[in-house]
Amino acid sequence: MPIDTSLEFVPINIAIITISDSRTKENDTSGDTLEKRIIDAGHQMIKRTIIPDDVSKIKDTLNAMSKEKDIDCNITTGGTGLTGRDTTPEAVKEIANKHIDGFGELFRQVSFEKIGTSAIQSRAVAALINSTYVFCLPGSTGACKDGWDEILQYQLDIRHKPCNFVEIMPRLNEK
């Protein structure tokens, strides 16, 4: 993927929200994986939290964190599967200002290359909520690695060409 090395890297402020009824700080390997990659890329880790698989709690947390001025991007892990408790996509759809449909499509393509037709079970989504990016990844560590390594590390790097999410951040509130 083309990175224009003549440009200076611009770090953004990122928060991680783990959505799970069973994960704790001690066993949140997906959150750990994302945090390491975010920091290694040069971005700022602003906040990290774990919340239950509850659509109201997910909506409340995403709404609140998307209004925090020091957070540019929320990355969630968990709750994107097909079980009854997997409600992250539903919560995001209810409160999103704009949907970033291509993220889920590209994530499933990347997943297909790694896990074949099992990729169809992923409901990874992305959106803008209050002009803050929200990327919702599955709860597996492998899926978080793939989502970051194959998509987000590039789209959250202003040097990535021909376009990226960072360069349009100043224009997200345009009317």
Predicted regions mapped to residue ranges:
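Non-catalytic beta/alpha edge segments that cap or flank active sites
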Residues: M1-K175
